[in-house]
UniProtKB/Swiss-Prot annotation:
Name of this protein: Protein rtoA
Gene Ontology BP annotations: culmination involved in sorocarp development; endosomal lumen acidification; exocytosis; hyperosmotic response; intracellular calcium ion homeostasis; membrane fusion; regulation of cell differentiation; regulation of cellular pH
Role description: May have dual functions, one in vegetative cells at starvation involving cell-type choice and a later function involving progression to the tipped mound stage. Involved in vesicle fusion in endo- and exocytosis. Involved in L.pneumophila intracellular growth.
Ranges of compositional bias, category Low complexity: 24-273
Signal sequence, renumbered to the chain: 1-19
One GO molecular-function entry: phosphatidylcholine binding
Taxonomic classification: Eukaryota, Amoebozoa, Evosea, Eumycetozoa, Dictyostelia
Gene: rtoA
GO cellular-component term (any): cytoplasm
Ranges where the record places region Disordered: 24-274
Keywords for this protein: Cytoplasm, Repeat, Signal
Organism, scientific name: Dictyostelium discoideum (Social amoeba)
Length: 367
């Protein structure tokens, strides 16, 4: 009997213990439900201090106030570094891998200030496509310290397409220190285009220019220089060298010079009866000796062309004309018109007019 009572007591204890275990497990499940409802990690919509962002709002794993993997302090899109877009490094806004410290930088450009686009490097203003520029806009891989630089150009002004320049605009590989430089040109000031080098003014396509505009490989210190010309002032075109004025196509000139010519001065007339003109090749001098006389001298072959070679014609019957083949022509009269090479000389009331310039000469003749 005692054994039966003891077994019954054990069964009651086991029942009580089982009942307490079920109550504890139910309470634990309730507490776990409460804990899981409290924690709730959503992993979406996080502004500031989110993963991959330095400060401000960041989208898609970017670092900085930037978008898509960019590192920057301003706003940045698509993997850019800086206040930049698409992989660019900048403090302003930079697009597509550009590096820029201020303003906007696009597409891989590197720049400290301004906008930089597509891999350009720029310190100020805008830099586009891989250009390097310190100020202004730089486009497409240009390197520049100031101004705008495009496509790999270096420029301090504006530089386009691989140009190098410190100021102004530089395009396509040009180098420019000031002004604009285009396409590989080097320019210190002004504009430089396409590989030109220019210190001031504009330089285009590989030209070198210190001032003014220089185009296509020209070198110019001032004025405009085009296509490989060298010019210190004025405009120089196509491989010309010029110290002042305009120079075209390989010419050296202090005034204006065209097509490979060398000239210190062009034509000039005065009312006092003394006028001197120096041509491009044969250094032709045309002087008004007195009120009714013209004297033409040249170091090369000088021709007076009308109906026949070595012949001059007067509009009136009076007056005397001398023509020789050794480079000396003398015309006297009040109304005389003669051609020397492609130069037409006329004297009317002691005034000399030059309408055309000689193109070439065959050299001096000896007798």
């Amino acid at each position: 009997m005692k054994l039966i009572a003891f077994i019954a007591f054990l069964l009651i204890l086991i029942t009580i213990i089982n009942a307490q275990g079920s109550i504890g497990s139910s309470s634990q499940s309730l507490s776990s439900e409460v804990d899981s409802s409290d924690i709730s990690s959503s992993g979406s919509n996080s502004t500031a201090s989110s993963e991959g962002s330095v400060s401000s709002s960041s989208n898609s794993g970017s670092q900085s106030t930037s978008n898509s993997g960019s590192e920057a302090s301003g706003s940045s899109n698509s993997g850019s570094q800086s206040t930049s877009n698409s992989g660019s490094e900048a403090s302003g806004s930079s697009n597509s891998g550009s590096q820029s410290s201020t303003d906007s930088s696009n597409s891989g450009s590197q720049g400290s200030t301004g906008s930089s686009n597509s891999g350009s490097q720029s310190s100020t203003d805008s830099s586009n496509s891989g250009s390097q520029s310190s100020t202004d806009s730089s486009n497409s891989g240009s390197q520049g310290s100031t101004g705008s630089s495009n496509s790999g150009s270096e420029s301090s002004g504006s530089s386009n397409s691989g140009s190098e320049g410190s100021t102004g605009s530089s395009n396509s590989g040009s180098e420019s220190s000031s002004g604009s430089s285009n396409s590989g040109s080097e320019s210190s000031s002004g504009s430089s285009n396409s590989g030109s080098e220019s210190s001031s003014g504009s330089s285009n396509s590989g030209s070198e220019s210190s001032s003014g505009s220089s185009n296509s490989g020209s070198e110019s210190s001032s004025g405009s220089s085009n296509s490989g010309s060298e010019s210190s002032s004025g405009s120089s075109n196509s491989g010309s060298e010029s110290s002042s004025g305009s120079s075209n196509s390989g010419s050296e000139s202090s005034g204006s010079s065209n097509s490979g010519s060398e000239s210190s001065s062009d034509s000039g007339s005065s009312s006092d009866g003394k006028t001197t003109c120096i041509s491009f090749h044969d250094t032709l001098s045309i002087n008004t000796v007195d009120d009714d006389e013209i004297e033409c001298t040249g170091k090369g072959e000088t021709r007076c062309i009308s109906d026949n070679n070595y012949k001059c014609a007067t509009k009136q019957r009076h007056g005397s004309i001398e023509c020789s083949v050794n480079g000396y022509i003398r015309c006297t009269g009040s109304n005389i018109k003669c051609k020397i090479g492609n130069t037409e000389c006329s004297i009317r009331n002691s005034r000399l007019d030059i309408t055309e310039k000689p193109i070439f000469t065959r050299g001096p003749r000896h007798h």
